[in-house]
C-alpha cells in the first residue's frame, strides 16, 4: 500500500496539526499521524505500547530516538482511547528519566559486610544474589517453605507474574506470594467467583455507547478512569435521554456530570443496594423468565468479622468469621422476604440519603426500557464488606435481566494496568493458579503440575500468606526472607507504623525490593535491585475489559538495571532443586537431581522451545539475549495452555504484537465482547440464550446479604471519618508521577479535604497546618476547603500519593474476611491544628 503524496502546503498544515497533537494531547488526523510516523526525514521511530498507568488499558504510540523515549501520544488505532490520553498519559515519556533513577544493586553494609543497620552501598549483581540466596536458604532451613515470601504487583507484565508464581509455588513450594491487587481487586474477584463461578467482567467498553443509564458506585471515573469518562460524557451529552447517577461518601469531579448525585454515610451502600432490590420486587419489575432460567438464590453467612488479628475484640466477637464464604440455598420468596426489610425509608435513615433520591435510583434499575451499566472500583472493593457489595450489585442486574448484552452491564473497573491480566488471570494470588484455578483444589493442582512437568504433590494445598498477613508474619518473625517487586507497600499498606514497618526492620528478616526509584519501601529494605521499566522490556498487560495487549522492548534500561523477569529467572539459578524439594518429590522425578530451579522451571522444553530468531527484526530483547531463547513467548504459550478450551482462551503469542489487544476468550481468531450471551460467547450452548457457565448448572447466584456496620466509626474522641484515594495527576504512591515535573507542579503535595463548616467549627482556615490522627498514627498536612473534592460534614479525604505524608500510618488494617482486601475508605480520626513550637 502506498502513502498518498502531499504538497508543501498540506505538509506544513499537517505538521502543525501533528505537533499540536503531541503537545496538547488532541487526536491527530490520520494523514498527520502518517506524517509523524512515516515521513522519511523523521529521526523518530514510533511503536505501540499499552499505557503504564491505570487499568483502562489505553494504547499509546511511543517515539524513540538514540535509545531514549522522547515522546508519546494517544494511539488513533486503539478502540479503548481512540487517540486520546489523560494528563498522566501525556507525560509517559518522562516517567523513566527521574534524576534519582536506580542503576545498580544497593546492599546495606558496614565495614564491607552486610549489616541490617548499615548504609546502602553499591554491589554487583553477583554479590547481591549471593547474599540474597544465602538469606533465602537460611529461611528455608529454619522454617521450610513458609519462611519465604513475595509481594508482587498488578503492574507486573503477564510473563513476570507467571514466572514469579511458578518460582514460588513450584520452585520454593511456597504459596506465600501475593500481588498488591489484593488491595484493589480481591473483592471483585471473590464477587465474580461467588456470583458467576468465573472471574472478570462479562461486558466491555462498548457498553458505554449502548447504555441509557450509568451508575457509579464508589468510583470517581472522571479522575481515576478519565478516558472512559470521556466516552461516558460523550454518550451523556450526545443523547438527551441518557442519565448518570453517582454514589459516593463525598462529592468529587464525577458529580459534575451527574443527573442524580447521592452522598451516603460510609458502609451504608449495602442498605441502598438492598433497598433497590426490594423496590424492583415490590413494583413488579423482576424479569421472572430470566430469573427462573438463569439464577438461583443463596443466603450468605453473616457477622463475619473484619479480618483483623485473631486476638482483636471484633474478631473474637464475630460468630460467622470461620465460615465467612459459606452460603445456603433459599427460594425467591425467601429472598424477597429478606430484602423486604430494606424499605427505601429505612435505607434513607441508615444512609442519610433522601428517600426520593434512592427511589429515583431504584427506578433507573427497575425500568425495563432502560439499559443500565453500573461501574464501580475502590469504593466497593476497599470495603470490609466489599465482596457483598459486588454480589449485591450483581443482584440488581440479575433480577432485571440487564446483563451480558450491549449497554446492560455490571462492570468492575480495575486500577492497575494488569491487575486483570497478571494478578487475576495468571493467578499470582496466594490461593490461585492460572485461569481461575486454586491451590486448594486437587484437580487444579494436578493440571498445573502436569503443565509445569512437576511431580505430584509439588504445589502446596493450602493458601499462603496474603498481603496483610505477610506484613503481620514479618512483624512476628515467622516470614524471614521477603522479596517485593513493582510495589511500594510501606506507603500503601494500612496501619504501617504498627504492622508494616516493624517487619521490614525486624533483625530476623531479610527484605529485598526491586524498584526503579528509591521509594519509601526500597529505603526500608536490606537489598535494593535496580529494575527496568515499561518499554525497557518486552511486555504484556491485561486491562479491565479482558483485553490483552503486547509491546516490544523499545529502549535499554540505564546502567545495570534489569527487568523483574530477568531477576526472577537469574535468581532461580542459585538453587539446586535438592535445596527446595523434598526427597519424596525427587524420588518421583529423579532426572532433575543436580539441576537448578532455573533448569526445572524455565528450561523444561516448553518455556525454552522458541528460538531468539522468532523475535521480530529490529527490536531489542535483553532477556532473550541473556538466556538464549525467546523467553516471553515460551512463558506466554505455556501459561496460555491453562486457559485454552475452558473459557479463558488466549490467542497465539504473535497475534498480540499485530493487534491493539484482543478480549478473551479468543476462539478461532475471534475475540469475545459479551460473555455468557449466545451469539457473542462461543462457550454458550446453542439455544441457551444466556449461560453462566462458570457453575456446572449454568446459573448465576443472587445473594441475600445484610447491611453490617464498619469496623471503626467516629466517636467523641475521633469524630471524623477518613477516606483515602487518588487524584487525577498522580498514580498510586507517586513513585513515577511525582518525578514528572509537570505532574508534580500540578499537585505537589497531599492535602486534607474537609467541609468548610467543619473547618470553621475547629477555627481552621484553608492552608492551615493540621494533624490528622487515628488510634494508630498521625500525619501533618494542610486544610483544603475548596477544590475538586467536597466532603460532607464529618468526613475528610486525604490522597495517598505523597511520601512525605504517609496517610497509611493512620488507616486501619481491617479487611473483607472473604477477599482479604483492605478497607482504606473508612476509619475514625481527629483533626487538630498544629501550633508553632
From Swiss-Prot:
Mo-bis(molybdopterin guanine dinucleotide) binds at residues 88, 155, 180, 184, 217-224, 248-252, 267-269, 378, 382, 488, 514-515, 537, 564, 724-733, 808, 825. Its EC number is 1.9.6.1. GO terms for cellular component: membrane; nitrate reductase complex; periplasmic space. Its main location: periplasm. It catalyses: 2 Fe(II)-[cytochrome] + nitrate + 2 H(+) = 2 Fe(III)-[cytochrome] + nitrite + H2O. Residues 44-100 form the 4Fe-4S Mo/W bis-MGD-type domain. The keyword Signal applies. It is found in: Periplasm. Binds 1 [4Fe-4S] cluster. Its cofactor is [4Fe-4S] cluster; Mo-bis(molybdopterin guanine dinucleotide). Pfam families: Molybdop_Fe4S4, Molybdopterin, Molydop_binding. CDD domains: MopB_CT_Nitrate-R-NapA-like (cd02791), MopB_Nitrate-R-NapA-like (cd02754). It is an enzyme of class 1 (oxidoreductase). GO terms for biological process: cellular respiration; Mo-molybdopterin cofactor biosynthetic process; nitrate assimilation. SUPFAM superfamilies: ADC-like, Formate dehydrogenase/DMSO reductase, domains 1-3. Component of the periplasmic nitrate reductase NapAB complex composed of NapA and NapB. This is Periplasmic nitrate reductase. It comes from Rhodopseudomonas palustris (strain BisB18).
Amino acid at each position: 500500500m502506498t502513502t498518498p503524496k502531499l504538497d508543501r502546503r498540506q505538509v506544513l498544515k499537517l505538521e502543525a496539526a501533528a505537533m499540536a497533537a503531541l503537545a496538547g494531547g488532541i487526536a491527530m488526523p490520520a494523514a498527520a499521524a502518517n506524517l509523524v510516523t512515516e515521513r522519511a526525514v523523521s529521526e523518530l521511530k514510533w511503536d505501540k505500547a499499552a499505557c503504564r498507568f491505570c487499568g483502562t488499558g489505553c494504547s499509546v504510540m511511543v517515539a524513540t530516538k538514540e535509545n531514549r523515549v522522547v515522546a508519546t501520544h494517544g494511539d488513533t488505532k486503539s478502540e479503548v482511547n481512540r487517540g486520546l490520553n489523560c494528563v498522566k498519559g501525556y507525560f509517559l515519556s518522562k516517567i523513566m528519566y527521574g534524576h534519582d533513577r536506580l542503576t545498580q544493586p544497593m546492599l546495606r553494609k558496614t565495614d564491607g559486610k552486610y549489616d541490617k543497620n548499615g548504609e546502602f552501598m553499591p554491589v554487583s549483581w553477583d554479590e547481591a544474589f549471593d547474599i540474597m540466596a544465602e538469606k533465602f536458604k537460611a529461611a528455608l532451613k529454619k522454617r521450610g517453605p513458609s519462611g519465604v515470601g513475595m509481594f508482587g504487583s498488578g503492574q507486573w507484565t503477564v510473563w513476570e507474574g507467571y514466572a514469579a508464581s511458578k518460582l514460588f509455588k513450584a520452585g520454593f513450594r511456597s504459596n506465600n506470594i501475593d500481588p498488591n491487587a489484593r488491595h484493589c481487586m480481591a473483592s471483585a474477584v471473590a464477587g465474580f467467583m461467588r456470583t458467576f463461578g468465573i472471574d472478570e467482567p462479562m461486558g466491555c467498553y462498548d457498553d458505554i455507547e449502548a447504555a441509557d443509564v450509568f451508575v457509579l458506585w464508589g468510583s470517581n471515573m472522571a479522575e481515576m478512569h478519565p478516558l472512559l469518562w470521556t466516552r461516558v460524557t460523550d454518550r451523556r451529552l450526545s443523547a438527551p435521554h441518557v442519565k448518570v447517577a453517582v454514589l459516593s461518601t463525598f462529592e468529587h469531579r464525577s458529580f459534575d456530570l451527574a443527573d442524580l448525585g447521592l452522598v451516603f454515610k460510609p458502609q451504608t451502600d449495602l442498605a441502598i443496594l438492598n433497598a433497590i432490590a426490594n423496590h424492583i420486587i415490590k413494583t413488579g419489575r423482576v424479569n421472572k423468565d430470566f430469573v427462573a432460567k438463569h439464577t438461583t438464590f443463596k443466603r450468605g453467612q453473616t457477622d463475619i468479622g473484619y479480618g483483623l488479628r485473631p486476638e482483636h475484640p471484633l474478631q473474637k466477637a464475630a460468630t460467622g468469621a470461620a465460615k465467612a464464604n459459606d452460603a445456603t440455598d433459599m427460594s425467591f420468596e425467601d429472598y424477597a422476604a429478606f430484602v423486604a426489610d430494606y424499605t427505601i425509608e429505612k435505607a434513607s435513615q441508615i444512609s442519610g440519603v433522601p428517600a426520593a433520591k434512592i427511589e429515583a435510583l431504584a427506578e433507573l434499575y427497575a425500568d425495563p426500557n432502560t439499559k443500565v451499566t453500573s461501574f464501580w472500583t475502590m469504593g466497593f472493593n476497599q470495603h470490609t464488606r466489599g465482596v457483598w457489595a459486588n454480589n449485591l450489585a450483581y443482584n440488581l442486574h440479575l433480577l432485571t435481566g440487564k446483563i451480558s448484552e450491549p449497554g446492560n452491564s455490571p462492570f468492575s473497573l480495575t486500577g492497575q494496568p494488569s491487575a486483570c491480566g497478571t494478578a487475576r488471570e495468571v493467578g499470582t494470588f496466594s490461593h490461585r493458579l492460572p485461569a481461575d484455578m486454586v491451590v486448594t483444589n486437587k484437580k487444579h493442582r494436578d493440571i498445573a503440575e502436569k503443565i509445569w512437568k512437576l511431580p505430584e504433590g509439588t504445589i502446596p494445598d493450602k493458601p499462603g500468606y496474603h498481603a496483610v498477613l505477610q506484613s503481620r508474619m514479618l512483624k512476628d518473625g515467622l516470614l524471614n526472607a521477603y522479596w517485593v517487586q513493582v510495589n511500594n507497600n510501606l506507603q500503601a499498606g494500612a496501619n504501617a507504623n504498627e504492622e508494616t514497618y516493624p517487619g521490614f526492620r525486624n533483625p530476623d528478616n531479610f527484605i529485598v525490593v526491586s524498584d526503579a526509584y528509591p521509594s519509601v519501601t526500597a529505603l526500608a529494605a536490606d537489598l535494593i535491585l535496580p529494575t527496568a521499566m515499561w518499554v525497557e522490556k518486552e511486555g504484556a498487560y491485561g486491562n479491565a475489559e479482558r483485553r490483552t495487549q503486547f509491546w516490544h522492548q523499545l529502549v535499554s534500561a540505564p546502567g545495570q538495571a534489569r527487568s523483574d523477569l530477568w531477576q526472577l529467572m537469574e535468581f532461580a539459578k542459585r538453587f539446586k532443586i535438592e535445596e527446595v524439594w523434598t526427597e519424596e518429590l525427587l524420588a518421583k522425578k529423579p532426572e532433575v537431581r543436580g539441576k537448578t530451579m532455573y533448569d526445572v522451571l524455565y528450561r523444561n522444553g516448553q518455556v525454552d522451545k522458541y528460538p531468539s530468531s522468532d523475535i521480530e527484526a529490529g527490536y531489542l530483547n535483553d532477556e532473550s539475549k541473556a538466556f538464549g531463547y525467546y523467553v516471553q513467548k515460551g512463558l506466554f504459550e505455556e501459561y496460555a495452555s491453562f486457559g485454552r478450551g475452558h473459557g479463558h482462551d488466549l490467542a497465539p503469542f504473535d497475534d498480540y504484537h499485530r493487534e491493539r489487544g484482543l478480549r478473551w476468550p479468543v476462539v478461532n481468531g475471534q475475540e469475545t465482547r459479551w460473555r455468557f450471551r449466545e451469539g457473542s460467547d462461543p462457550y454458550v450452548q446453542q439455544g441457551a440464550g444466556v449461560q453462566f457457565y462458570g457453575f456446572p448448572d449454568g446459573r448465576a447466584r443472587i445473594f441475600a446479604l445484610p447491611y453490617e456496620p464498619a469496623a471503626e466509626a467516629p466517636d467523641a474522641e475521633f469524630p471524623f471519618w477518613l477516606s483515602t484515594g487518588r487524584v487525577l495527576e498522580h498514580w498510586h504512591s507517586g513513585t513515577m508521577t511525582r518525578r514528572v515535573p509537570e505532574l508534580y507542579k500540578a499537585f505537589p503535595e497531599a492535602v486534607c479535604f474537609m467541609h468548610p463548616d467543619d473547618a470553621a467549627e475547629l477555627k481552621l482556615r484553608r492552608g492551615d497546618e493540621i494533624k490528622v490522627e487515628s488510634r494508630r498514627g498521625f500525619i501533618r498536612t494542610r486544610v483544603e476547603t475548596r477544590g475538586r473534592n467536597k466532603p460532607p460534614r464529618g468526613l475528610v479525604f486525604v490522597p495517598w500519593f505523597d511520601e512525605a505524608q504517609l496517610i497509611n500510618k493512620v488507616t486501619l488494617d481491617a479487611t473483607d474476611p472473604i477477599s482479604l482486601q483492605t478497607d482504606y475508605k473508612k476509619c475514625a480520626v481527629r483533626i487538630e491544628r498544629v501550633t508553632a513550637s
